Amino acid sequence: YTFRAKGSGKSGLISVSHCGQEVLSRSACEITDKEITARFFIGFPANGRTINATELEKILFDFLPVCIEKAFFYKNTDHRNLEQAIFLAEDQDSIRSQLTKKNLVAFVADHSVLPRESGISSRPLKDSVPFMSPQSLRVSMELPHEGTIYGMGIPAGITLIVGGGYHGKSTLLNALELGVYNHIAGDGREYVITDANALKLRSEDGRFIRNVDISLFINDLPNKKDTRCFSTEDASGSTSQAAGIVEGIEAGSKVFLLDEDTSATNFMVRDTFMQEVISREKEPITPFLERARDLYEKAGISTILVAGSSGAFFHIADTVIQMDSYHPVDISTKVRALCGKYPLTEQKAPAFSMPQSHRILSKKLPGIRSHGRGAGKPERLKIKVHGKDGFLLGHENVDLRCIEQIVDTEQTAALGLILKYALENLVDGQRTVSEIVQLLSKELQKKGLAAFADGSSLPCGYAVPRIQEIYSCFNRYRG
């Protein structure tokens, strides 16, 4: 249904959230047992700077009721499509609930379409090779509506994804990292389901870090800086990745997803030659290779890692999946046999202990308005969203470009809203980041995003982020 009102600019424009491939909880629509609440934008018809009341009356009382009737009245919906959408969501949730029971961290159904149309499109690639699970990793899932489906189950532990260039390693990992969300019918990844708290990690040169215990990975810095409470305005790749893992542990993630291509090499592994040239006493970094096993056995955190250059990870992997011309092959048995032929020089890592970060979130005092009716009063915090890349809160830029599981600008907008609320209501110089996020999580579960809205109403244009992304946002706020 389209309508164009008389007037200048966006007169008569009626718009609502533009949904993508992922299913997100959005402020655009809320359904309870008693009511449906829809939120949308209307461009008031105007002549210059004056609202055209006659045209506005037509929008509100003639055209808008037609839109509402077509969109929300059950008699006007495609009953079959509506039913299938509900059934699909229930089946997807069923798979996710079965992962832990089956000791899995992810599931990829047979016949899934993993490649995307392009780097700027999340639609499925036409004529791509459908996913088919290797027999040794094939599991079944009993779903309430679809019945029994089969696919590849990725077990808890350390999983290595290997293969030649362009054979589909990163494509599989990308599908798994977005498997924390349900997907719409026709996406191709409807039954690619990952543990809901799984976290994609990468290096972030130049990121801000405050009071993070990175001693699990980095110690004995030449400048004598205490790595149990480490801060920097300009982190290196290895330091940023170490901080990201520690922050992920704090956020409750039990599955880490990493790609060698976007990781700091010196953080991930040190080969035998380098160990001979630079002794352990001269190297402050304990590589991830030496910590991954402890993370699983002592903290219950699984790892899914894409690797293509270093064979050292074969020695710690529980499961090894080779992508061969877009087909997964379980080569775990072959790898175990070869590990004896190519032994790994053992380096004794420092004793494992869980990080103990105690980070207090701080805030700057707002500036004072210098002119206008509010002269002499504190400036209001304003949010300016920069797509999925981040937002400006007041004068502080929050850079979220490396948070790869943010899939929608509306999630970024919601993160800005939540951070603003926290700074104005919860940050007191005493509470830790973890305590603040826990309080926010309770409010989110109780009232939804409306708990953080300015005034009494929540507008359209917000989508609920995961707790992991809330932590990531707060950890990147320089304050």
Question: Could you tell me what each predicted segment is?
Answer:
Residues 115-150, 185, 193-198, 202-209, ...:
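N-terminal pre-Walker A segment at the start of P-loop NTPase domains
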Residues 1-103, 114:
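N-terminal accessory targeting/assembly segments
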Residues 228-263:
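Phosphate-binding/switch loop-helix module in NTP-utilizing enzymes
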Residues 52, 207, 215-238, 270-285:
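Flexible beta-alpha connector loops of hexameric P-loop NTPases
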Residues 297-300, 306-479:
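Conserved NTP phosphate-binding and transfer environment spanning the P-loop NTPase/kinase superfamily
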